[in-house]
From Swiss-Prot:
Entry GO MF terms: DNA binding
Ranges of residues in domain Response regulatory: 3-119
Job of this protein: Member of the two-component regulatory system UvrY/BarA involved in the regulation of carbon metabolism via the CsrA/CsrB regulatory system. UvrY activates the transcription of the untranslated csrB RNA and of barA, in an autoregulatory loop. Mediates the effects of CsrA on csrB RNA by BarA-dependent and BarA-independent mechanisms.
Domain of life where this protein originates: Bacteria
Modified residues (4-aspartylphosphate): D54
Protein name: Response regulator UvrY
Gene label: uvrY
Length: 218
């Protein structure tokens, strides 16, 4: 039996995935979490084989949760299931320790196939995302996102900023000082040749890394 943990801040999304998996032989949803922090705690305290992880959630988010789970419970396989499929996120997520990467638009059978594949020790990346990653290696000048220059920590903080989170919130959730968070912010601004959080969010929207409605919280 493959024990699966569902991690998404939208209850309807979790309910939909649970419904898909509940009739699949050999797969059992054993728990749910609505944020990255709870997912990390759940994996440390319970027996779970595969985590279906959302990227954008309150708190530390899916990228940092993936990194923490991969470091502390290496036998747990993580599949990022997200609307964010543009470079450089897939590569960054896989580098953080994920075993799979799927779009939330994936067919139910592909989700099942991904769970079984990563449980057996393989990696699973949706074909369209894998093609995009391959093209970025072959023709980087045509496909590379400006965000590819960011470190994993900078990318994580960028995603939190685009969700409208403030420096004090980010510093508390990541156990960093506000000064350190601001250092990352200014480094990002320099790399991306921008001058503030709103401009950062506009750039992220243009490259498919966040949704336009996030601007309302800026």
């Amino acid at each position: 039996m493959i024990n699966v943990l569902l991690v998404d801040d939208h209850e309807l999304v979790r309910a939909g995935i649970r419904r898909i998996l509940e009739d699949i032989k050999g797969i059992k949803v054993v728990g749910e979490a609505s944020c990255g922090e709870d997912a990390v705690k759940w994996c440390r305290a319970n027996a779970v084989d595969v985590v279906l992880m959302d990227m954008s959630m309150p708190g530390i988010g899916g990228l940092e949760a993936t990194r923490k789970i991969a470091r502390s419970t290496a036998d747990v396989k993580i599949i990022m299931l997200t609307v964010h499929t543009e470079n450089p996120l897939p590569a960054k997520v896989m580098q953080a320790g994920a075993a799979g990467y799927l779009s939330k638009g994936a067919a139910p059978q592909e989700v099942v196939s991904a769970i079984r594949s990563v449980y057996s020790g393989q990696r699973y990346i949706a074909s369209d995302i894998a093609q995009q990653m391959a093209l970025s290696q072959i023709e980087p000048e045509k496909t590379e996102s400006p965000f590819a220059s960011l470190s994993e920590r900078e990318l994580q903080i960028m995603l939190m900023i685009t969700k409208g989170q403030k420096v004090n919130e980010i510093s508390e959730q990541l156990n960093l000082s506000p000064k350190t968070v601001n250092s990352y912010r200014y480094r990002m601004f320099s790399k991306l040749n921008i001058h503030g959080d709103v401009e950062l969010t506009h750039l992220a929207i243009r490259h498919g890394l966040c949704n336009a409605e996030t601007l309302s919280s800026q």
